Amino acid sequence: MALPNCSLNVNRELVDPNFESYRLSLDSIPTYNIELDAAVAEVKLKDSQYTLDHVRAFGMFNYLQIDPWYEDSVYFVDSKGRVLNLTVTLDTALGKPREMFHFESDSSSPEALCASLSLTSATWAALSDGNGKLTLLRTSKRGESSHLKWEPMFSESLGDPFIIVHSLAHVHSNVHTVEVLLLRVQKDPSDTKGSGFSVSLEWITVDNSAGQGESEEKKYAVRKRRVMKGKSVPHYAAVEPQGKGVIVASEKPFAFTEVDGLPLEEPPVQDMEVGNSDPIYFWQQTEEDVTLCVRLPEGTTKDDIRFKLTVDCLRVRVGDYAPLLDGQLFAPVDPEASTWTMNDDKSLEVSLQKRSEGPLWSEVVLGDRRGEYLMNDEQKSQLQQRLSYLTSEDLNPNPEKDKPPCNAQELEDCDMSPEDSSTLMRFDGATLKPNNVVSLGSNQFLFSVHIDPSETPAFCLRHDVDALLWQPRPDQDNNIWEHISTFNALGYVQASKRDKKFATCAPNFSYAALCECLRRVFIYRQPSPVDTVLFNRKQGRQVGQVAKQQVANLDTNDPVLGFRATNERLFVLTLNNLFVLKVNN
């Protein structure tokens, strides 16, 4: 597993340390009910799909998709194999959902999964039939041509059944490319100690580069297939814009294993001969910088040195030989403040200025173990103090050890610490290696949401009692994870909802919403100014803002299958109904 090399930086200006609580509002929420002509195409878990990963991936699947490009427009698939759309313009004049596309689906197959739809761009969509077939659809501009049926441009069976996690489209050199991320939970005979299943994410690239002649129709075909595997269903997975990489957040780490059906193997690189003794370089550090001394072959001149340093990568080579050092740095550095010098033709001294002072590095280049770390006396003393609790002069430092605080037989799997801490990883699309790793630790994943359709979906994590919304920005080297909004105390509130199934928020951050498995919806609004004078008698101050909580009870006994939010409305999908809640005016 790759070691964490960066962290999530909270914007303190977006955090309210004085937030008290939500006030229950009795204001009614206008709710409109649309009865469906046919039931939603729900596929329940089979007896063979008994693991927690199956429940997370397919049992908690959100059957309702919202259109990020056209507000208040949602899509779902019904039991007749129809992709249906509802676009709201006037709440009091809601029509029936319209059919946009029809496909053949066999949900009775023992391996069948739920059909899944992903809106790829303003004019394209990706559809899985639940039996392993991927279809790419040209939708035209959905907001302007909502009456037009969708046109299939690509349809191909891709093996075992899957659901679509994310998709996007981009154009380069007149070639239209669609990137699709597929999720599978498959039997794994090699996993004898675990559940017997493994989780895979397949990143597929489809384009129309074939048929470049003027009179020849450009046909879409699969150009590349990359598979990454892990041991847990990811909380979050998305392809970056332009297909430059993949972002995955999961309890257990993922790694790429296959490319176009062939096992991914590291090419053997012949190291340059620099002498008989190891290591190749020595290094030491302070809180401000890292200094390393790289051994050079005899006869090396300054003109032979090829040195390249960016914010997060270092490359050192001599002439045309294989690089002595090449890879991702443990943490970002300041290239302008970093230097290198050559000492008496035998070594190269490199000084790297840390971008963030304080954290100590455990290695220079991620995965490179050919260097030796040299500690000074002060660092050795600090290390001994940190490890002093592991040694003791007392024969029995814990006299209460014969009185265990609990019965070990009463412990369950959920009481144990996980083998791997949850991580957020960004994989480079060219090297397929993680170049940005964040340890999420105790920051519980809550939900993901499309804020800007041109960007990667944002994700929400619990930080202490609050819920913080993060927007990935891969193009920003110094701040790839940007804190864009905060929902006060939502982390604490959602933990008390034992029957919670879905969570989401409005794209303009005006409210967050939770939905239980059955009937109830909770809305938590951002603090807003009050019309009257309120006075806090305990603290002796006037209250200028109040955050309201509202509860809606849906008139149905069917379980909730889908839940999406826009700036003005909440959409709740059940087996036979679609509810529209008017949240904001």
From Swiss-Prot:
Instruction: Tell me which UniProt keywords the record has, alphabetically.
Output: Cytoplasm, Nucleus
Q: Where in the cell is it found?
A: Cytoplasm; Nucleus
Return the GO cellular component terms, semicolon-separated: cytoplasm; nucleus
Phylogenetic lineage: Eukaryota, Metazoa, Chordata, Craniata, Vertebrata
Q: Which residues form the CS domain?
A: 276-365
Task: Read off the SUPFAM superfamilies from this record.
Answer: HSP20-like chaperones (SSF49764)
How is this protein named in the record? NudC domain-containing protein 1
Q: Where is this region: Disordered?
A: 392-420
On whether S-adenosyl-L-methionine is a keyword of this UniProt record, the answer is no
Principal place where this protein is found? cytoplasm
What's a Pfam family in this record? Answer: CS
